[in-house]
Amino acid sequence: MMFYRLLSIVGRQRASPGWQNWSSARNSTSAAEARSMALPTQAQVVICGGGITGTSVAYHLSKMGWKDIVLLEQGRLAAGSTRFCAGILSTARHLTIEQKMADYSNKLYYQLEQETGIQTGYTRTGSIFLAQTQDRLISLKRINAGLNVIGIPSEIISPKKVAELHHLLNVHDLVGAMHVPEDAVVSSADVALALASAASQNGVQIYDRTSVLHVMVKKGQVTGVETDKGQIECQYFVNCAGQWAYELGLSNEEPVSIPLHACEHFYLLTRPLETPLQSSTPTIVDADGRIYIRNWQGGILSGGFEKNPKPIFTEGKNQLEIQNLQEDWDHFEPLLSSLLRRMPELETLEIMKLVNCPETFTPDMRCIMGESPAVQGYFVLAGMNSAGLSFGGGAGKYLAEWMVHGYPSENVWELDLKRFGALQSSRTFLRHRVMEVMPLMYDLKVPRWDFQTGRQLRTSPLYDRLDAQGARWMEKHGFERPKYFVPPDKDLLALEQSKTFYKPDWFDIVESEVKCCKEAVCVIDMSSFTKFEITSTGDQALEVLQYLFSNDLDVPVGHIVHTGMLNEGGGYENDCSIARLNKRSFFMISPTDQQVHCWAWLKKHMPKDSNLLLEDVTWKYTALNLIGPRAVDVLSELSYAPMTPDHFPSLFCKEMSVGYANGIRVMSMTHTGEPGFMLYIPIEYALHVYNEVMSVGQKYGIRNAGYYALRSLRIEKFFAFWGQDINNLTTPLECGRESRVKLEKGMDFIGRDALLQQKQNGVYKRLTMFILDDHDSDLDLWPWWGEPIYRNGQYVGKTTSSAYSYSLERHVCLGFVHNFSEDTGEEQVVTADFINRGEYEIDIAGYRFQAKAKLYPVASLFTQKRRKDDMELSDLHGK
């Protein structure tokens, strides 16, 4: 019974007779009666899943005023993965949004017992994250810096301090650790039951032993659910079905892709130590040893994330409740050995049980939330990557905000279901990817690491040709993109194995590519960019785009407009360039990972008009970016047409012949601020055009380049990218893009009212460029992204992206500056004067480096100074 007390089944047994009904109108109904009650025929919201996520969503929706909610659980409440959760609540995460979710969960669970009267076993133990290597310690220092600035106490401690906090630990191989004192342990099942109880008291109806068969959809909108006990009409459906979320999504009349897959997850339970551990004993995370350790009733609970995980398929009839899977001591042996090395005194301790339970993982190790791009009203919260307890409270809150208000209070793009496409939902892909993901939970992740499984899923027609020329690849939205090109004299194996927080081994390679972009001409394959065409029989396309986009698109044919697709709050839902092909046709180019999100937003807001056509043409065109001053010479020679600015001005688009190929869309822009052209080539001509470009370009010093060079070029020019620097909570006025907004273009557009108000009231954050002056790129840790920014010693924001500028010979960071009141912490208006008068530091893993803040690209400042000098010289000669 000790095992089941740990997992809080006793909590269900000690509950009042009304627990199995949960309807606030029938609190005295017995469990048997509850299961036999008829379901309601309609509701506003139906939630599938009675675990930590489903009950959290129900709890928060009811707190926000929605009462007509039905929660369905196919077995018993909290009897799925929630029941087997190890009960560790940890706030130490790499992503800020995950840190905030876990912090909210911690505070929520702390007060649940007082709110509901249900004991949750909440005990504040703190956590200690061990480092056996200097790189691991650097990683912890980066996390520590991020935790501190959002108000989560943590500190880097010595091995000696570790031994003082946990006397059973062997610390001889440690170089340091991170202590997070407010982390906790809790009974996850009891937390779920407490959330359900509170939701029930707020009017939520909860029915167990009721299976959802499929979701009913009409014209792309949720209309109801079919259960084994009848139908319920509803406006919203929330899939919180855990490991069954994938299959439930595919069972719909209009399938919803939810890419997740389950693996077996092991942990052991021991009997109490001779001197039982105190309940406040800190939880230990030894990621280098691949294990976690927590106190459990005076003994030990310890599991981990092994290098060779065992994926589980979920075809066939679903189990109503998850059972303990078969023990596998041979498989667990490496984790057990690691545990005994860390805590040698456990050698003689009696082990009670080896628990084997399923955990779901996603292709990128981040949970899945949000509305389906295919079905309006279909929301998902699943794929918690063994962090369901830590994220459950915060994730449930954000999803509830999404449903009630139309968007969450934080930027959750990194967790949005729409970051995936159907291509990531292949069961074979998921099986292979989760076998990589599960070990990565504790692997050391240095900047710019890449997944190794599920690769070469989407490729340019030039992939083999570029690969043969030394391309090293990264993956974005399933698309292979070149990082850089390895010269023949470089050690390829050494480059592939090079992982560091310091100066990377590819530094010189990218320097050569950047230099070529500035002095000669380079080619970058950018075929992964999202491409849409919007056409109409009349003026419908222009009218719709004028309403959806902030800039004025009523421009002459052939002109390109940089613009944004904004939400009601004025934030960027999409950042793109649009070329007017003719009076009734437009060509739209967006970031790679915007493909699903942008399509869903357009379809949601475009009228149902048979005279209006939206087409995804991403796959139809190969995109080559010709960057550099000699790009004009290459293209002139290949097209036999003048390409000088007089004949081909900036931000202009024209269909041309290049080599033997016709119909090439040539655009005078490069996404870098450097001169050059984008070529959008029908895929059947791609190889020919590339070969011709490289052949003719030889005399002009042409070479291939990759996205690392592009990143360096665009950051030093202060070019912000959507998803990295700006998001749906960023307005054009906050990132210096007022010129891309036409408030007086003659018609209303989404977000206009919010921008007018912001223009009057001022902005509360501002995207700023930072140049590190006292930073030694050869010896010091590099900035990558997410580093805290300090102004006059006070925290004001974080970096969003960073790169080494080979022109300035300095690191350049982009990031948002806020103006927090020193007295109240409230945000105040940020002005140019506020930014310019501050002295700044960037915190890189606990070390602060002085930085100069700029609101405009340095190149522009140099140009302005040169023009001023020229004017002064002219005036002098005039005198």
From Swiss-Prot:
Residues 1-27 form a transit peptide. Belongs to the GcvT family. Its main location: mitochondrion. Keywords: Mitochondrion, Transit peptide. One of its GO terms (cellular component) is mitochondrion. This is Pyruvate dehydrogenase phosphatase regulatory subunit, mitochondrial. Heterodimer of a catalytic (PDP1) and a regulatory (PDPR) subunit. It is found in: Mitochondrion matrix. It comes from the Eukaryota. Decreases the sensitivity of PDP1 to magnesium ions, and this inhibition is reversed by the polyamine spermine. It holds the Pfam family GCV_T_C. Disulfide bonds: none annotated.
